[in-house]
């Protein structure tokens, strides 16, 4: 199947942004790598900034759909099982889009108008869905043993770490985060943590 000009630009941009960073990559380099004219980038994305906005939005659109699918199963699974399924789906999504994931997670650490917009839409939705799952669990007497913001912070750290520190993981820990076995093994470790921060009973340990 022939790759479209737009898709070639996207693939080259993701590769170069990962290798050289957004600021260190020029429009000409992207065009050369994609074997297209510089004018094509202006036509499809209005320049490098528009290209980055497209990539970030594309990533979070897919990420958001993963969260929404989990939210649709609230009434059919226990809180822990639902969180575990959500975590596995997120890890799978990140692995299947690992170069894009790495680029986006680096960019969201930088304060900008685009990132503030992402925070107010996609990431607020993410918080809402996590909170909804936990609140539904409380109705079934499944309680977190730590405050919800702390739980979300720790979970997000676990999910993002492999894509923020891939060199550390491969060069220091001698693991291969790009291999499918890694995220499946990593999921098993997150599962242990999730099991450890819940209790069942009549009263929660935290507010």
UniProtKB/Swiss-Prot annotation:
DNA-binding interval(s): 26-45
Domain HTH tetR-type positions: 3-63
Domain of life, per lineage: Bacteria
Induction: By phosphate starvation, via the PhoP/PhoR two-component regulatory system.
Assigned keywords, A-Z: DNA-binding, Repressor, Stress response, Transcription, Transcription regulation
GO molecular function, one term: transcription cis-regulatory region binding
InterPro entries linked to this entry: DNA-bd_HTH_TetR-type_CS (IPR023772), Homeodomain-like_sf (IPR009057), HTH-type_Tx_Regulator (IPR050624), HTH_TetR (IPR001647)
Pfam family, one: TetR_N
Gene Ontology biological-process annotations: regulation of DNA-templated transcription
NCBIfam families: septum_RefZ (NF037937)
Protein name: Probable HTH-type transcriptional regulator YttP
Annotated source species: Bacillus subtilis (strain 168)
């Amino acid at each position: 199947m022939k790759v479209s000009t737009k898709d070639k630009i996207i693939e080259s941009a993701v590769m170069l942004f990962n290798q050289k960073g957004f600021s260190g990559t020029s429009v000409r380099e992207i065009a050369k790598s994609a074997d297209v004219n510089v004018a094509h980038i202006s036509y499809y994305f209005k320049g490098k900034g528009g290209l980055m906005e497209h990539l970030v939005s594309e990533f979070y659109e897919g990420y958001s759909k993963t969260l929404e699918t989990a939210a649709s199963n609230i009434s059919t699974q226990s809180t822990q099982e639902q969180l575990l399924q959500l975590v596995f789906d997120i890890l799978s999504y990140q692995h299947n889009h690992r170069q894009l994931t790495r680029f986006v997670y680096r960019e969201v650490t930088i304060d900008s108008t685009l990132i503030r917009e992402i925070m107010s839409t996609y990431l607020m939705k993410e918080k809402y869905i996590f909170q909804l799952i936990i609140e539904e669990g409380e109705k079934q007497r499944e309680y977190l043993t730590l405050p919800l913001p702390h739980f979300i912070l720790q979970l997000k750290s676990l999910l993002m770490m492999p894509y923020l520190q891939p060199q550390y993981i491969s060069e220091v820990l001698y693991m291969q985060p790009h291999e499918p076995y890694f995220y499946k093994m990593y999921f098993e470790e997150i599962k242990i943590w999730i099991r450890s921060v819940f209790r069942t009973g009549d009263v929660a340990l935290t507010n």
